[in-house]
Regions:
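Positively charged n-region of N-terminal signal peptides that target proteins for export
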Residues: 1-5
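Bacterial N-terminal signal peptides
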Residues: 7-15
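Asp-box/BNR beta-propeller blade signature and adjacent active/binding-site loops
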Residues: 19-413
């Protein structure tokens, strides 16, 4: 039976019974794309502010297509009570729609909020270039812009273009310069361990061509950037949209979109302060290794590592969570999980990629990109695309607060 989509704007609170569990999960539809509307929403980004507020962002695609094809704005909503209710929709930044202009559109946002202050950083694509087009080159690059807040997202700076600050990091690479890139949308990683500058270190994972993913990092909350592993490092050659996460010992994991699952790689520091270190070899995670399988799709997802308690013996552990559409195709977004070993140093790429637990199914309909963060109450804030419409160009942007007990079939909290 097909689910009929009701073309009204729904801002209220709903309850959903999980497909895998009888527990009730709170659900908010933050942005809705009516099927009759020609202006779609897409692309989730979320951050938890230092003061406890939660900011959710999304593309509002007036051009009807991806960033690079015309005018795209970024809209937002804020929760000031931990996700229980949400304020009105607002425009964070508006594209001019002027063809060829650097401010033609703004989209594919990635965001981080500093854990020690009210500082917030949003990175996004700007302009009217298409990432994969042959005409998008080092001389005509996919451009990168930032917005900054110093007061937990209440007010924002003027946008600033930082394209050259990123691209020049790779101009002297033995592999040649980066022709086109963008920061993987959703959540920028802030280290829980490394602070050698004004702020805890942040990492942004790049989708880049040629030669796949790169990772950049900053010790001054995005004022200056460095290439993790140096300009020649290729964490995931030919990788697609990526995310970063940090192991409890400070090593960095990149998780990259792949057909049928994910690609993982781990960065081993030799000197955390200077950033020196080396990437390993890529490991695939999919059905073959009992990994994070996604049937008949490749899609942006989120990797998150959180502290937890194993309910069987009350032992404190760390869990890795990875979201993907379970499929077939872009449908049935879910969350895989696995307990990390107590000896974190023993984690290898092969062991991390394999043997994940049966996933929790978040959505029971068409669904795609997702991101998540750990709330102060220990639950998971999950923000994702659902009810895909307009031939895949639009969706509803849905927020759910999900307890770890629900995700892990009552094994952890």
């Amino acid at each position: 039976m097909r689910f009929l989509k009701i073309c009204v704007v729904i801002w209220g609170l709903f309850s959903l019974i999980s497909c895998n569990d009888a527990a009730v999960v709170n659900k908010h539809v933050l942005f809705q794309t009516p099927v009759s509307d020609t202006i779609p929403y897409r692309i989730p980004a979320i951050a938890g502010m230092h003061n406890g507020d939660i900011l959710a962002l999304t593309d509002y695609r007036l051009c009807g297509n991806d960033i690079g094809y015309g005018r795209v704005d970024i809209h937002g909503r804020v929760s000031r009570n931990g996700g229980k209710s949400w304020g009105e929709e607002f425009v964070l930044i508006k594209g001019s729609g002027v063809s060829g202009a650097t401010d033609c559109g703004f989209g594919d946002a990635a965001m981080v909020a500093d854990r020690e202050s009210g500082d917030v950083l949003v990175m996004m694509v700007c302009g009217e270039t298409v990432y994969w087009h042959e005409t998008t080159t080092r001389q005509n690059p996919n451009r990168i812009a930032v917005l900054r807040s110093r007061d937990n997202g209440k007010t924002w700076s003027q946008w600033e273009e930082i394209t050259e600050s990123v691209y020049t990091l790779f101009d002297d690479s033995v592999h040649g310069c980066v022709q086109s890139c963008f920061v993987g949308s959703g959540k920028i990683l802030q280290s829980r361990k490394i602070k050698v500058g004004s702020h805890y270190r942040i990492y942004a994972a790049l989708c880049a061509r040629p030669n796949g993913n790169r990772v950049i990092y900053s010790d001054d909350f995005g004022q200056t950037w460095h290439a993790l592993g140096g300009p020649d490092a290729l964490p995931v050659p030919n990788g697609d949209e990526p995310k970063c996460e940090e192991l409890p010992d400070g090593r960095v994991i990149i998780s990259s979109r792949a057909w049928g699952g994910r690609y993982f790689n781990i960065y081993e520091y030799t000197d955390m302060a200077s950033g020196a270190g080396v990437w390993g070899e890529v490991a695939g995670s999919g059905k073959r290794v009992n990994g994070c399988a996604s049937l008949e799709n490749a899609c942006n997802g989120e990797l998150l590592i959180v502290p937890a308690v194993r309910k069987e013996d009350r032992k404190k552990v760390h869990l890795a969570l990875q979201s993907v559409p379970l499929g077939p195709q872009r449908a049935n977004v879910g969350i895989y999980y696995k307990e990390l070993p107590e000896d974190v140093a023993s984690i290898t790429l092969e062991s991390f990629a394999a043997d994940w637990e049966k996933p929790y199914q978040v959505s029971d309909t068409t669904s795609a990109y997702s991101t998540m963060l750990l709330l102060k109450n220990g639950n998971i804030a999950f923000y994702y695309e659902e009810s895909i419409c307009l031939d895949g160009w639009g969706s509803d942007m849905v927020y759910k607060e999900i307890p770890l007990e629900v995700i892990t079939a009552d094994q952890y909290q």
